[in-house]
């Protein structure tokens, strides 16, 4: 029997459509499966569906409704081992209640920084 290894999956939570599309394309080009969510509610649906998700990358300021920090707290309760990367251009890490095992990327970030951060969590050499 042959075991097929799947590509690592990223749950990308970004409310800015253009940035979400660019990040989805960039991560897909790097060989990741991307589950894109425009808001916290949609991200929670992905998590509750049982989808294979290896890491969550979320904006903090998600517009209307739940913010990324609250989403991360809920995600951590559902999946305590899920690594979480926060991103924000308006807040600093000190203003955000982060969950254990998470990290913060200030906007603007580069794709190289995103790659390196994901690779650090997933233990692969994609950066």
Model-derived segments and spans:
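Acidic, metal-coordinating helix/loop segments flanking the phosphotransfer/catalytic sites
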Residues: 36-55
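Charged docking surfaces used in two-component/phosphorelay signaling
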Residues: 21-29
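The feature encodes the CheY-like receiver
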Residues: 63-65
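Negatively charged, flexible loop motifs adjacent to catalytic sites
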Residues: 89-93
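Hydrophobic/aromatic residues positioned on beta-strands within the core alpha/beta folds
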Residues: 85-87
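Short amphipathic alpha-helix used as the core "switch/output" element in two-component signaling
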Residues: 67-82
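Non-catalytic signal-transmission and effector/linker regions of two-component phosphorelay proteins
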Residues: 1-12, 17, 30, 41, ...
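Active-site residues of response regulator receiver
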Residues: 59-60
């Amino acid at each position: 029997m042959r075991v097929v290894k799947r590509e690592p999956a990223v749950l990308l939570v970004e409310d800015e459509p253009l940035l979400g599309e660019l990040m989805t394309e960039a991560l897909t080009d790097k060989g990741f499966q991307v589950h894109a969510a425009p808001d916290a509610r949609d991200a929670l649906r992905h998590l509750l569906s049982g989808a294979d998700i290896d890491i969550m990358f979320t904006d903090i300021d998600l517009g209307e409704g739940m913010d990324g920090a609250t989403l991360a707290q809920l995600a951590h309760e559902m999946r305590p081992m899920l690594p979480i990367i926060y991103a924000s251009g308006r807040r600093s890490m000190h203003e955000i209640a982060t969950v254990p095992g998470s990290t913060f990327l200030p906007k603007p970030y580069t794709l190289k920084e995103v790659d390196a951060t994901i690779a650090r969590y997933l233990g692969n050499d994609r950066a």
